[in-house]
């Protein structure tokens, strides 16, 4: 708390990005709660103690709205909250604490956000197993990390966003299905598309989002899903050639993580 107080002292704004996300938030809920909820409370208290309180830009998640399979898209910011895992419940609790505080804040509920730099982060085996459990028609809206950074940066000096809760997604051109999104990687690596039969039918909490207000206020939708595809193609242009002789073996290993009969 002392370090946080020192870091926040005399700042004009704070972007609070520290968080433990799935899958670790689900396998180590105690640690995740300490970082996600208690850590956020420390930041809130530090801001509240400042003579001139800085704006807190708080990244939340589309996951707070729960499973999307019975929802008519796009998801609206005022739709009910339904936590389906620890991570979503932590975000809901943090949002609740922000609204109960007297500090200036803006909440940004983020869509699926990865790029060519962080796509391999985390427990790969656990993520692959989970990936194959989900329904191929699950809606997902991608948010490029560049677009997220622009949105957060633009929020810092925009008084119109204070007290608002906004969705961050890269727009209609970045709205796709789970199958299409997952196949971007193997397709780019020259492995071909994964078969529909490898996937299960579990719902998920991603969705297409109504980002009209956030785009109007923050003007952030720039790179999107097309930018992500270009980055992967550039990053793996030589690896694709090296992997070509082993593509069958790699596909077979990936599909071993599926509980379905592909």
Question: What are the roles of these predicted feature ranges?
Answer:
Residues 1-35:
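NAD(P)H-binding glycine-rich loop region in Rossmannoid oxidoreductase-like domains
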Residues 20, 41-86, 106:
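Conserved Rossmann-fold NAD(P)-dependent oxidoreductase catalytic core, especially the SDR/UDP-sugar
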Residues 34, 69-108, 133-134:
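Catalytic helix-loop patch of NAD(P)-dependent Rossmann-fold dehydrogenases
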Residues 84, 111-118, 134-146, 170-174:
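Glycine-rich "substrate-gating" loop/helix at the edge of Rossmann-like oxidoreductase active sites
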Residues 101, 115-125, 155-166:
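Glycine/proline-rich active-site loop of Rossmann-fold NAD(P)-dependent oxidoreductases
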